[in-house]
Design a protein with these regions (language model features):
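Short acidic, Pro/Gly- and aromatic-enriched capping/linker segments at domain boundaries
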Residues: 313, 318-322
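Cleft-lining beta-strand/loop regions that shape enzyme active-site pockets
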Residues: 95-98, 106-112, 120-123, 128-302, ...
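Glycine-rich active-site/cofactor-binding loop and its immediate structural neighborhood
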Residues: 77-119
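Conserved functional hotspot residues or short segments at active or partner-binding sites
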Residues: 332, 348, 353-364
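Extended, small/polar residue-biased N-terminal targeting/export presequences
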Residues: 30-95, 143-145, 149-160, 167-173
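Terminal targeting/pro-maturation regions of precursor/exported proteins
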Residues: 1-59, 208-209
Length: 364
């Protein structure tokens, strides 16, 4: 059960008094509404969604049993049918946090920060996150047309994308540089596989005595599990705080690095507007500790942590339970993290200017 706190103590009588108008309204619907055969589960779910929407927090949301199961499978299996985009609600608009690399959306030119204003000609105004995800998901080979508003472009962009099976590999690696001495690591998401996959890659780099520097690519990484972010940051930061987390009572917990066993290679971290949440924890820790340099563009600005609570019927509620701050106690939420070295992508070139710049710095 849940205790309800009022003025620092449990006050169930006050809670039930506040709920009386709700039960009155529910009974009026049950016994006075013109259609007798109403779907009571649907009505209750709508009431829960309305309650959470009143908090004006895009990250606190209700998930019906199907949506909760889907989210858990996405996080732990990393495989689903869809377009390959991570979306959220930002400024009351359906917003793409990031396209997932090597997916239909990525290949179609979808960009972080794009606003989805239409799906198959239907406006997304007032559309909830779960409703949008349900529409965008689908079988391989089916198509959907998105109406996109993009910054600095007046006209509506209509982009048709064919759905596919999206499989997310958390960590990718490559050896780069003219002397093959730069280790490139791309982290696409923070899930239960990220830390062991990164460990394997860094062990390979450690055995290769030629490696003289590391590029950690967090661009278009929308985040994921908090613990995974702490593990990743700890691979590069030997000691000291990785992140501070403040709860509703103002109590701050400082989470320290879990220590690292790797050489302190020169480090560049690539970031952009699609780097969010757990990515910002890692980027902030690297920047504040002085362990490396951030290169690219300002990050998304999601500095809050959600916890999922299961309800008895198999549904769940994701509730924002705390806010996080960088080791130097900077707030990130709605602000983002500025790079140490600003490098904007070349719009009219296939060259990866940010990656090339990081390689150039490491080769100097």
């Amino acid at each position: 059960f849940y205790n309800v706190r009022a003025n620092g103590k449990t006050n169930e009588e006050e809670l039930f008094a506040n709920l009386e108008p709700f039960f009155e309204a529910l009974n009026l619907v049950r016994f006075e509404y013109v259609e007798k055969d109403i779907d009571l589960d649907k009505v209750i779910q709508g009431a829960i969604r309305g309650m959470l929407k009143a908090l004006d927090d895009p990250y606190t949301r209700y998930m019906d049993p199907q949506a909760l199961k889907r989210e858990q499978e996405d996080m732990f299996l990393g495989r689903f049918g869809g377009l390959g985009i991570i979306i959220s609600i930002k400024d009351d608009q359906l917003t793409i946090i990031s396209p997932i690399e090597d997916t239909p959306a990525y290949r179609a030119g979808i960009k972080a920060g794009d606003r989805i204003v239409e799906i198959d000609g239907k406006t997304t105004e007032g559309m909830g996150l779960d409703e949008a995800v349900n529409i965008l998901r689908g079988d391989k080979g089916t198509e959907v047309t998105l109406g996109i508003k993009r910054e600095n472009i007046e006209e509506l962009l209509e982009i048709t994308i064919i759905r596919d099976i999206i499989e997310i590999k958390a960590v990718k690696k490559e050896i780069m540089g003219k002397d093959d001495n730069i280790g490139y690591v791309r982290i696409t998401t923070f899930n239960i596989n990220t830390e062991p996959e990164l460990e394997e890659v860094l062990n390979e780099f450690k055995k290769d005595s030629d490696i003289q520097g590391i590029i950690l690519d967090l661009r278009n990484n929308p985040g994921g599990l908090l613990d995974s972010a702490i593990e990743v940051a700890s691979k590069f930061i030997k000691d000291g705080p990785v992140v501070h987390i403040k709860d509703r009572d103002g109590i701050v917990a400082s989470i320290e690095s879990r220590g690292n066993k790797y050489p302190e290679w020169p480090l560049f971290v690539l970031i952009n507007e699609g780097s969010a949440s757990a990515s910002e924890i890692v980027a902030g820790a690297v920047q504040d500790s002085g362990r490396g340099k951030l290169l690219g563009e300002k990050t998304f600005g999601k500095g809050v942590v959600q916890q999922v609570f299961n309800l008895y019927d198999g549904s769940g509620i994701a509730i924002t339970t705390s806010e996080y701050f960088t080791p130097s106690e900077r707030s990130i939420n709605h602000i983002g993290i500025e790079p140490d070295i600003l490098v904007e992508p070349a719009e009219d070139s296939e060259q990866d200017m940010q990656l090339n710049k990081a390689i150039q710095f490491l080769e100097e």
